[in-house]
Amino acid sequence: MMTTIPNLPDELESEILSRVPAKSLAKWKTICKRWYALFRDPRFVKKNLCKSAREVMLLMNDRVHSISVNRHGIDDRFEPSMEFSGKLRSLIDSKDVKVSKEANLARSLNTMYAKLKSNRISKLCGGVMNHFNIR
């Protein structure tokens, strides 16, 4: 005899899933159509980004470093920004960073979205835009 769990209300399911790390959510998007749609909803992405721990890519002395930052409970009224100058000569390999054909540093799932070509950092609640849609 198989025991089934009754369906959770959508709000509760969304709240629980918003606390799951984005790497796991990316793997789960094919579980069901409802979750796939939820993970693509910009409100859910923003909620997940606001609740997740932060990782930041820092360019220092021609090296790229990954720094984890837990901002839970910190006032988010300001958006910190960084400006990089100079040329990137090498990239330290990281399983969380994908480098596209256009030589852009792109989308570490719980980090930021940065285009080295233009030296701009796009932020959504201190995290990444296109959080779950890796190109």
Swiss-Prot record:
Pfam families: F-box-like. InterPro entries: F-box-like_dom_sf, F-box_dom, SCF_F-box_component. Residues 2-48 form the F-box domain. PANTHER family: BNACNNG10540D PROTEIN (PTHR31672), F-BOX PROTEIN CPR30-LIKE (PTHR31672:SF13). This is Putative F-box protein At3g17270.
